[in-house]
UniProtKB/Swiss-Prot annotation:
Positions that bind ATP: G28, H29, T30, G31, S32, G33, K34, S35
Protein name (Swiss-Prot/TrEMBL): Energy-coupling factor transporter ATP-binding protein EcfA2
Keywords: ATP-binding, Cell membrane, Membrane, Nucleotide-binding, Translocase, Transport
A Gene Ontology molecular function term of the record: ATPase-coupled transmembrane transporter activity
A GO cellular-component term linked to this record: ATP-binding cassette (ABC) transporter complex
Family of the protein in this entry: Belongs to the ABC transporter superfamily. Energy-coupling factor EcfA family.
UniProt keyword annotation of Nucleotide-binding present: yes
Native source species: Halalkalibacterium halodurans (strain ATCC BAA-125 / DSM 18197 / FERM 7344 / JCM 9153 / C-125)
EC numbers on record: 7.-.-.-
């Protein structure tokens, strides 16, 4: 409680810029403040001090509701387990709810719902189905379509793969990256999954105890592996393997590599140089 002995500052001295059109990952240990930070992006939480700026719009402690409504249209927030937010009788009604609440006509909202269902990888035959008759993964895609129906400029993903098996995680993240590219969205991924951050992000923000511990592109951040480990974070599996290979074979000046394909290419070239003969990928 503010002003009491039990007051706890969740975020302090946090300052950074997310470029328009970028894919930014916010990573941090449990309790680092990353999810609290994400909820400030669309005014779900307001700062007790300071300002959150979205283009020409601002969120402050005393921000008036009309501006917040516009901000919440521009910034779509996908929570953990977004399927828990489904409530309508049909998939179509659920996707249409947000746009119609903002004044979009029913006909236009229905057209948008059909297009978005395809975009998230579901057939339009699901439009009249109850969302509660679908599988967990399908329900999550419907919930995501509902967020996209607001046509946000910024998409904030708070641990969007929580509760999914590895294959489901891969499919959902590939879908988000495709949407990021096709819709030219500014995408913010809040995650503890270092492999997803390394694979998709242009920029990475590392949170620790409510502060920004480091920022930079993925090459810069993951080159500081020892510091990440000290913050209670892992490095991506590919980089872990790369560190083992460097130690085993005495390699130097190895750039950060973020996929098995990049690692295979690099090792093939290294072996070719060492042996002086062509070498196929391994």
């Amino acid at each position: 409680m503010k002003g009491s002995p039990f007051e706890k500052v969740a975020l302090s001295d946090v300052s950074f810029t997310i470029p328009s059109g970028s894919f930014t990952a916010i990573i941090g240990h449990t309790g680092s403040g990353k999810s609290t930070l994400a909820q400030h992006f669309n005014g779900l939480l307001r700062p007790s001090k300071g300002t959150v700026r979205l283009g020409e719009l601002e969120i402050t402690a005393d921000q008036k509701p009309p501006s917040l409504k516009e901000i919440r249209r521009k910034v779509g927030l996908v929570f953990q387990y977004p399927e828990h937010q489904l409530f309508e009788e049909t998939v179509e009604k659920d996707i249409c709810f947000g746009p119609m609440n903002y004044g979009v006509s029913e006909a236009r909202a229905k057209k948008r719902a059909k297009e978005l269902l395809h975009l998230v990888g579901l057939p339009d035959t699901y439009l009249q189905a109850s969302p509660f008759s679908l599988s967990g993964g399908q329900m999550r895609r419907v919930a995501i379509a509902g967020v996209l129906a607001m046509e946000p400029d910024v998409l904030v993903l708070d641990e969007p793969t929580a509760g999914l098996d590895p294959e489901g995680q891969r499919l959902i993240m590939d879908m988000f990256y495709r949407l990021h590219q096709e819709k030219e969205l500014t995408t913010v991924l809040v995650t503890h999954n270092m492999s997803d951050a390394a694979k998709f992000a242009d920029q990475i923000i590392v949170m620790s105890q409510g502060n920004v511990a480091m920022t930079g592109d993925r090459q810069t951040v993951f080159a500081r592996a020892d510091e990440l480990v000290a913050l209670g974070l892992d490095v991506p599996e590919t980089l872990q393997l790369l560190l083992q290979v460097k130690e085993r074979f005495g390699l130097h000046d190895v750039p950060p590599l973020f996929s098995l394909e990049e690692l295979a290419d690099f090792l093939a070239k290294e072996l070719q140089q060492k042996e002086g003969q062509p070498c196929s990928k391994i």
